[in-house]
Amino acid sequence: MFEYSKKPKILVIGDLILDQYLWGHSSRISPEAPVPVIDITSKNFSLGGAGNVIRNLNSLGAKVEVVSVLSECSTSKKLKGLLKDLKIKTHLFTQKNHIASKKTRVFSSRSQVLRFDSEDKLDLSSSLEIKIINKISSKIKEFDCVIISDYGKGVISKNISKSIIKISNSFSIKVLVDPKGTDFIKYKDCYLLTPNKKEASEALKIDLEVKNNIKPALLKL
């Protein structure tokens, strides 16, 4: 799709999520409830959500920058540290009293036994939306491509999504979207939309398990 003699410079905009992995083993059942007691022996963290996109692009040699919203919580600090480790240039905005998204997966003897999430969804103020849009507008000409990585956590509001696409298109910069939710209208005029089958089926209200529905679904998209 893209041919470059140099490393492409890509702007990723979206929801940063911290993935935490707890590793351990179990040899007994809790006396409080019929559940295993996991003795944790190690843990590690990685970038999730839009962070996973950043990590993959970085490993492929692209020059990546990110625009997102975090807070002053411990999860946000860990995410910033992981981005710094990858030498990713960041444009991060702060929403006070917000808990950044963290997904914790618990493993016992290499098998996942539990996942629990800690987060609250962002409700961006108009003033913060304007700051984000202005930042993107001031930087957009530097990039070869823009990726919107929407995990439904609030960074990609309808206003921000439409503004990103409009600004990028005005400079003939392609916008690729990994969508979330059923409101695909907010991604109108993007270059490429990449829903999975379940997401497309729910957004279009078309059963994609029926083979004859696939072509009408593509036309509707």
Where are the model-predicted features located?
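Substrate-binding N-lobe of the ribokinase-like
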Residues: 2, 7-9, 31, 35-101
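Gly-rich Lys/Arg/Thr-decorated short loops/hinges at beta-loop-alpha junctions or inter-strand turns
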Residues: 31-38, 109-122, 195-202
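Conserved phosphate-binding/catalytic loop of the ribokinase/pfkB sugar-kinase fold
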Residues: 91-98, 103-140
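Conserved phosphate/ATP/ADP-binding segment of small-molecule kinases
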Residues: 154, 158-221
